[in-house]
A protein has these predicted regions:
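The feature captures the beta-strand-to-loop junction immediately N-terminal to the Walker
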Residues: 33-35
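Helix-to-loop junction immediately C-terminal to a conserved catalytic motif
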Residues: 48
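Conserved ABC transporter NBD signature motif
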Residues: 56-68
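Conserved ABC ATPase "signature" region
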Residues: 101, 107-128, 180
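Conserved ABC ATPase signature
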Residues: 132-136, 140
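A short, proline-enriched helix->beta-strand linker immediately N-terminal to the Walker B motif
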Residues: 151-155
Length: 263
C-alpha cells in the first residue's frame, strides 16, 4: 500500500525529517507520535504530495508520489478554515468531487450529492446537509471535514492532528467515529497526533519519531481486543503498558551512534 524509503525534508538549513522508512499495509491504521517539532506534519505533507522531499521516496500502490495522488484524502486540525461558510454542508462535502483528478471519472451533480449524503450519513450528520458549517459545533464541523474526505472514497486517509481543537468528550467521540468508519470502509489511515492515549487507543501500530530532525525511533504493535471502547479498553493492563512505553520513548532522547543519549 504505502512504502516510504529514506524520506528527508529540509527547510533551508533546517533539517525537519531525515531518513524515514515506513511501510503501511492495506486496511491498517497507523498512528505517528513524537516530541513537538519532530516533523510529524512535514512527514504527512510529504506523503500527501504537498511538499517535495529533499531526499528519499514515497510510493503509494506501486506508484511514486510526485504530486498530490488520486485516491488520497487529508483531514487537517483547523477544520474552520477548510469549510466554506457560504456553502451548505452537503456542498462542502461534495466539493472535492468536482475537482477530481487522475483516472477516476468525475461524477455528475446527482452522483456528487449522493456521495456527499452517504458520507454525511457515515459520520452521523445526515440531517445537517442543508445547513451551513457556521451553524454547527466544532466537533460537528470536524465530522463534516471527515465526511468530505470519505466522499472521495480514498484508498489512503491522512489525518494531521484532526482532533486537537475539540474538547475531551468530543475528542473521544471522534476517536470512536474513526474506528467505526475504518471498520465499515476497510480504509487505510495514517494519523498524526500529539496525544499518546489516542495513538494507542486508535492504532494498530504506533510509530514514534525522535526529536528533530525526525527519524523513526520505534514501531509498537497494538494488540488490544476489539471492539475497543473508551472505558474498558483504557482500563486494560496492556493499554497501560503500551501507553507507558510510548510515553517513555517520546520523552527520552534517542541514543546516538555511540549509544549515548543525543543532546
Amino acid at each position: 500500500m504505502l512504502e516510504i524509503t529514506g524520506l528527508t525534508r529540509s527547510y533551508g538549513a533546517h533539517l525537519a525529517i531525515e531518513g524515514v522508512n515506513l511501510h503501511v499495509d492495506d486496511g491498517e491504521l497507523v498512528t505517528i507520535v513524537g516530541p513537538s517539532g519532530c516533523g510529524k506534519s512535514t512527514l504527512l505533507r510529504c506523503i500527501a504530495g504537498l511538499l517535495r522531499p529533499t531526499g528519499g521516496q514515497v510510493v503509494l500502490d506501486g506508484t511514486p508520489v510526485t504530486g498530490v495522488p488520486d485516491g488520497l484524502a487529508v483531514v487537517f486540525q483547523d477544520y474552520s478554515r477548510s469549510l466554506y461558510p457560504w456553502m451548505s454542508v452537503a456542498g462542502n462535502v461534495a466539493l472535492p468531487l468536482r475537482a477530481r483528478r487522475g483516472d477516476r471519472e468525475k461524477p455528475g451533480r446527482a452522483a456528487r450529492r449522493a456521495a456527499a449524503l452517504a458520507a454525511l450519513e457515515s459520520v452521523g450528520l445526515a440531517d445537517t446537509a442543508g445547513k451551513y458549517a457556521w451553524q454547527l459545533s466544532g466537533g460537528m464541523q470536524q465530522r463534516v471535514a471527515i465526511a468530505r474526505a470519505l466522499a472521495c472514497d480514498p484508498v489512503l486517509l491522512l489525518m494531521d492532528e484532526p482532533f486537537g481543537s475539540v474538547d475531551a468528550q468530543t475528542r473521544e467521540d471522534l476517536e470512536d467515529l474513526l474506528l467505526r468508519v475504518r471498520a465499515e470502509r476497510d480504509i487505510t489511515i495514517l494519523l498524526v497526533t500529539h496525544d499518546i492515549d489516542e495513538s494507542v487507543y486508535t492504532g494498530d501500530r504506533v510509530v514514534v519519531l525522535t526529536r528533530g530532525p525526525g527519524r523513526v525511533r520505534a514501531e509498537l504493535t497494538v494488540d488490544l481486543p476489539g471492539p475497543r471502547d473508551q472505558i474498558s479498553t483504557r482500563e486494560l493492563r496492556e493499554f497501560a503498558r503500551l501507553r507507558g512505553e510510548v510515553s517513555r520513548l517520546v520523552r527520552e532522547r534517542a541514543p546516538d551512534a555511540t549509544g549515548r543519549a543525543a543532546g
